[in-house]
Regions:
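Cysteine-nucleophile protease catalytic domains, especially the papain-like/related folds used
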Residues: 1-79, 302, 323-326
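Generic ordered-secondary-structure signal
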Residues: 5-15, 104, 122, 183, ...
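General structural signal for secondary-structure boundaries
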Residues: 19-29, 49-52, 87-93, 165, ...
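Active-site-adjacent substructure of cysteine-protease-like catalytic cores
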Residues: 58, 63-154, 166-167, 374-376
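Noncatalytic regulatory segments and standalone regulatory/sensor domains
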Residues: 128-376
């Protein structure tokens, strides 16, 4: 078996043993599933293309999504390439969102700086954290808006100077010190930086870089990570004054710095966690009664201090089974401390703005269930 086949086999071992919707796959079944898509002989195996990797996952009942770091085009004389994800979120950030969600991601590598070099395949199943979160901002309001190509700008006048309101966002991924990697020729559970992908101690060991990755998703997860990120950040921007009001209630003053964390999870696990970690009866009743789709994207936010204490100040819940259309159509609830909005399946978009005050804790538990488990 080649590296791609080994990694697909172990990913399907995970899905088949954990979820009743999937089953494990034999090497012979993997061979049969790509027979119709191959124009060359399959034995002896030369490995799988990215499209064939995705096809195997499709045959196993998953709905994979492929991300390429670079794309090629013909300029009429030569084939040229360009980086696809130059704006927020970038290629590595998208990868992190899926890893943060506890999804095993199939990563395709190429020898660094050599287009004709060796290819390789690994699986990423988690990440390690630094002791203290750094302040590498995603950007101030004007920066992350321009990176997202958003044309709308919210300005205030200060004497003769026009300035942006400042809301500094820090991605939780800047606190990542490395990723947990499974590689078929070395010891498992290695923690590697994405900038240092070597799998041998030899002096002439090949150094790899990521060329693409395949995310095996549940078939009804229609919202991609980059869309969930854009909606969440845009909503934070539109809700700037409400967010600041919540920060002020918690005794925080400018400059406002928020750590955001984005992940995909099941509504069942999310509701169970929120109910079990609730402090007040009102909180338990609220989370037990809200209607949620099977899968949701959650964007948590808090300060660097609350983040390190595994607490948050607010969260945005998005419908992961919806496609990206209008910003508010996928928003289910927004909680900012003890202020919360909720829009049911049949409610209009205007309900996203309908805030209600509930006797709930202003700081509440960071979600740590059914995605990545902490190993101390």
């Amino acid at each position: 078996m080649t590296c791609a086949e080994v990694n697909i086999w172990q990913i399907m071992e995970y899905f088949g043993n954990r979820y009743k919707n999937y089953r494990t796959i034999l090497p012979s079944e993997m061979f049969e599933s790509v027979m119709d898509t191959s124009d060359v002989r399959l034995l002896p195996s030369d490995g799988l293309t990215v499209e064939q990797e995705s096809h195997v996952f499709m045959k196993c009942g998953l709905a994979p999504k492929i991300y390429y770091k670079r794309s090629e085009y013909d300029d009429g004389e030569f084939m040229k390439s360009y980086e696809q994800y130059r704006r927020a979120p970038n290629f590595e950030e998208i990868l992190h969102f899926y890893v943060e969600s506890g999804i095993p991601v199939l990563i395709n590598l190429r020898e660094k700086g050599n287009k004709e070099g060796d290819n390789h395949c690994i699986t990423c199943i988690g990440h390690a954290l630094k002791e203290n979160i750094g302040k590498n901002y995603i950007g101030e309001r004007d920066d992350f808006l321009s990176r997202m190509q958003t044309t709308k700008k919210y300005l205030i006048d200060n004497d003769d100077k026009t300035e942006y309101n400042r809301l500094n966002l820090i991605g939780s991924w800047v606190n990542c010190s490395g990723y947990v990697i499974l590689e078929d020729h070395s010891s498992p559970y290695q923690i590697k930086s994405l900038d240092d992908l070597k799998f041998s101690e030899k002096e002439n060991a090949i150094e790899y870089e990521i060329e693409s990755f395949v995310v095996p998703l549940y078939k009804h997860v229609f919202m991609a990570a980059e869309d969930a990120y854009e909606i969440a950040v845009d909503l934070l921007d539109r809700s700037y004054y409400g967010v600041v009001e919540g920060l002020n209630r918690n005794g925080l003053n400018p400059p406002y710095e928020l750590v955001i964390r984005l992940f995909l999870t099941t509504s069942k696990s999310y509701k169970n966690f929120r109910i079990n970690s609730a402090v007040t009866e009102n909180e338990k009743v609220f989370y037990s009664q809200i209607a949620l789709p099977k899968f949701i994207w959650v964007c948590e936010y808090g300060t660097s201090k609350t983040y390190m204490n595994h607490k948050i100040l607010g969260e945005i819940v998005l419908d992961a089974t919806s496609a990206k259309h209008h910003i508010f159509e996928s928003v289910i609830s927004v909680r900012n401390g003890d202020s919360v909005t909720y829009r049911g399946p049949a409610d209009p978009n205007s309900y996203v703005h309908l805030r209600r005050k509930l006797p709930m804790e202003k700081e509440f538990a960071m979600y740590e269930e059914n995605n990545l488990k902490r190993i101390c």
